[in-house]
């Protein structure tokens, strides 16, 4: 089925985080919620939870009773120029090329209003900017993926969702019938595997 709309994940699809700054924020946030100091035991516990929650930090805090957008709000307090860097330098150019062919949108567990401009990406390029707070539950819950279909006003099979984590991105997207693409790795679970970001343009151009 022809692709008529492309939706993107953000973290480790469009941009990666500064590991040191990100680690500091996630451990301190976890310690704050639990009322415990940051120590090696807490860090190990967090990393175990990260695996159990399919690499979704938002879902960890959601499971601890925080609202769906709580982790996004913590991330939004940081300087995006220090927190994020593009996965590939030509991503803004490629996004512009894709949007000349089909609409593009973004679904992320974090708020992107400040992060995107810091990376040379204009929020106005995207038809929709969907957050986990808007969806109701963070990924990997399917809520946001059903919302993608609603917002796109298309059949699920006409929408391509691109992300980097099988359990958090690919499987819930497939659950609602979206076409799926995994980036920077390969997986038989996804309909497409992209070695580099520009490969997405090649697919949409067909």
Regions found by a protein language model. Give the residues of each.
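Asp-based, Mg2+/Mn2+-dependent phosphohydrolase catalytic module
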Residues: 1-8, 69, 92, 96, ...
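N-terminal helical cap/lid subdomain that shapes the substrate entry/recognition surface
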Residues: 2-92, 111-114
